[in-house]
């Protein structure tokens, strides 16, 4: 079922790619933390301080689907159409975790996709090093191919991040 949702997302994203990338548009994607009390929150605060950025948030609240029919329709519309458009037209995309629809989409060459990850350092296995089930590992590999940058806490951990994200 998830694969169907990812495929629908990708089709809508491709349509949204017909719109130009908007200079200064930044999409902050936080699929598991809607409060921005992590590295994405720091990026958001800095972008707001600098000004001149059109910040678009994509959080787990956009992804959650309700049992209430009206909320379900609104949530599905927001997830499939609004978040696809925001990603497709963003000049910069910052993520702090895996966002599996990335496995099915291709960004404009103008878009920079930055994985911040939600936990600095390498105290645990993460990304491709966490030995996920084969079907999840394949999705993660496809997601990682979309990253143009990954941020880590030190030069000393670059090899671990490179391995974890397949960079």
Language-model features: where?
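Active-site and donor-binding regions of nucleotide-sugar-utilizing enzymes
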Residues: 27-167
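Membrane-proximal basic amphipathic "stem/tether" segments
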Residues: 1-33, 74
């Amino acid at each position: 079922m998830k694969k169907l949702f990812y495929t629908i997302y990708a089709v809508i994203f491709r349509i949204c790619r017909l719109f130009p990338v908007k200079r200064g548009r930044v999409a902050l994607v936080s699929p598991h933390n809607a409060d921005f009390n992590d590295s994405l929150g720091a990026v958001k605060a800095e972008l707001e301080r600098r000004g001149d950025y059109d910040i678009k948030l994509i959080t787990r609240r956009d992804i959650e689907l309700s049992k209430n029919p009206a909320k379900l329709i609104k949530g599905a519309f927001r997830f499939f159409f609004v978040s696809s458009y925001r990603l497709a037209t963003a000049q910069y995309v910052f993520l702090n975790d895996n966002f599996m629809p990335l496995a099915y989409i291709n960004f404009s060459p103008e878009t920079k996709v930055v994985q911040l990850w939600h936990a600095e350092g390498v105290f645990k296995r993460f990304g491709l090093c966490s030995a996920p089930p084969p079907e999840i590992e394949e999705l993660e590999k496809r997601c990682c191919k979309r990253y143009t940058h990954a941020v880590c806490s030190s030069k000393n951990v670059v090899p671990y991040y490179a391995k974890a994200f397949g960079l």
